[in-house]
Structures are given as structure tokens and as C-alpha cells.
């Protein structure tokens, strides 16, 4: 179902978008799509931190564009009062190639005291209104390290993505050189906090049989509530 937003250059437009994203990670569906690119392109500049949900979503889309691009079609979105130009997928992939040499990727940024306070106030408002609060979600950036330079990284990533469980969604990934011909897999994932424990995911699945044929160890690079 198509979504329409109005004049995202105005405070009223940003407030509506912020309210819309209060209970959503993306504009439509459960992964970034061209709908997110359309709304992202309609914003002339990064949103103020007072729009907590818009800022969180904007930073997440920026990170995806840096490392892999967005290709999902989405459900359709219209932004009235703005000139929207959705970036082509090829351009985002080119940008990702330029960033392949970066070992450290700051996907989420630090949450400010102002953002924390605003989040708490919104949660209190939802509770006071009698609405059922959705289970929290988190975005995680994981480093997955192979045994040596002879490890087949394609099979390593296949082993990672073969792990399925309720509340777990694998996202964008890239290979990052660490030296001596060895590369590590850097991969994003979204989890439902009540259903998935990252520690259990690493210990019981990623570094256990059969995945440990390719995976030596895993490190949590970034963990952000969304």
C-alpha cells in the first residue's frame, strides 16, 4: 500500500514522518527499499536530532548506501511538496566500492541524552494512551572472521545466512581486508530483542558446527536499539 508524505522541508512534515517511524524501522516492509530512498532523497539535509525516529532511520539508510546500496522495490511512496530523485542502484554500488577500504564503519552513531529523553517520553506516551508497545528491535553490525586466508569466504557467508530463526533478519554485508591476505565478513542484522540473543547466536550457531568449519570467531562491532 502506497504511503504519502507532505513537504518534508517543513516542521509539520517532519513531525508526521517522525510519528510514522515511531513503530517502524523502514518506510515500508521489513527491509530497506526504494521507498526509503525516495523519502531520503526528499530531505534536503540531515534531520534535526529532535526528530528522534527520523534521525535514527536517516542514519541507518545512510549507512546502507555507504556499504551496499538498496535494491528492494517497496510498496510505493509519494512525497508531495518536494522534488524527489531516487538514487539509482548502480550509483549506490559504486559508492560502496569506493568505501571498501574502510575497516571501521560507524553505522549508527552515539545516542545523545536528548534522543534518549525523547525516546523515553514517547514510550511513556504510548503506555499512557493504552496502546500495546511493540517488542523492541536492535540493529547489529557483526565481524565474522575466517580461520585463514584459504577459507572460502563465499561459503562462509552462505553458512552465516543459512542460520534462520524467528526475529532474525540478515542485511547488507561486505568483505574487509585485515592483512596477510585475510579478509573478514562484515554483516548487518536486525533482531527482535525478545526473540534473539546475539550472544546465543554467536555461541550456539555461528561458532558451532557446521558453521565453524569456516568461522573462527565473531565480534560485535555496533549494537543499536531501533
From Swiss-Prot:
Cellular component aspect of the GO annotation: cytosol; eukaryotic translation elongation factor 1 complex
Chain intervals with Acidic residues compositional bias: 97-113
Biased composition regions of type Basic and acidic residues, renumbered to the chain: 114-124
PANTHER family hit by this protein: EF-HAND AND COILED-COIL DOMAIN-CONTAINING FAMILY MEMBER, ELONGATION FACTOR 1-BETA
GO MF terms, alphabetically ordered: guanyl-nucleotide exchange factor activity; translation elongation factor activity
UniProt-listed Pfam families: EF1_GNE
Similarity comment text for this entry: Belongs to the EF-1-beta/EF-1-delta family.
Residues in the signal sequence: none
Species this chain originates from: Spuriopimpinella brachycarpa
Described function: EF-1-beta and EF-1-beta' stimulate the exchange of GDP bound to EF-1-alpha to GTP.
Assembly with partners or alone: EF-1 is composed of 4 subunits: alpha, beta (1B-alpha=beta'), delta (1B-beta), and gamma (1B-gamma).
Region of interest called Disordered, as start-end residue ranges on this chain: 82-131
Keywords: Elongation factor, Protein biosynthesis
Name the record gives this protein: Elongation factor 1-delta
Amino acid at each position: 500500500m502506497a504511503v504519502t508524505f507532505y513537504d518534508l522541508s517543513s516542521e509539520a512534515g517532519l513531525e508526521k514522518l517522525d510519528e510514522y517511524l515511531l513503530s517502524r524501522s523502514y518506510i515500508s516492509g521489513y527491509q530497506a527499499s526504494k521507498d526509503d530512498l525516495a523519502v531520503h532523497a526528499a530531505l534536503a539535509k540531515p534531520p534535526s536530532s529532535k526528530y528522534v525516529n527520523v534521525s535514527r532511520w536517516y542514519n541507518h539508510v545512510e549507512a546502507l548506501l555507504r556499504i551496499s546500496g538498496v535494491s528492494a522495490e517497496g510498496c510505493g511512496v509519494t512525497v508531495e511538496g518536494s522534488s524527489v530523485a531516487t538514487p539509482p542502484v548502480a550509483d549506490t554500488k559504486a559508492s560502496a566500492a569506493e568505501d571498501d577500504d574502510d575497516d571501521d564503519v560507524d553505522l549508527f552513531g552515539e545516542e545523545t541524552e536528548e534522543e534518549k529523553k525523547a525516546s523515553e517520553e514517547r514510550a511513556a506516551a504510548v503506555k499512557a494512551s493504552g496502546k500495546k508497545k511493540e517488542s523492541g528491535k536492535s540493529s547489529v553490525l557483526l565481524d565474522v572472521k575466517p580461520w585463514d586466508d584459504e577459507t572460502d569466504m563465499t561459503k562462509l557467508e552462505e553458512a552465516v545466512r543459512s542460520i534462520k530463526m524467528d526475529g532474525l533478519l540478515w542485511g547488507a554485508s561486505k568483505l574487509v581486508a585485515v592483512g596477510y591476505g585475510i579478509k573478514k565478513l562484515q554483516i548487518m542484522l536486525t533482531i527482535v530483542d525478545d526473540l534473539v540473543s546475539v550472544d546465543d547466536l554467536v555461541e550456539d550457531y555461528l561458532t558451532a558446527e557446521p558453521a565453524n568449519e569456516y568461522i573462527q570467531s565473531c565480534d560485535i562491532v555496533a549494537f543499536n536499539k531501533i
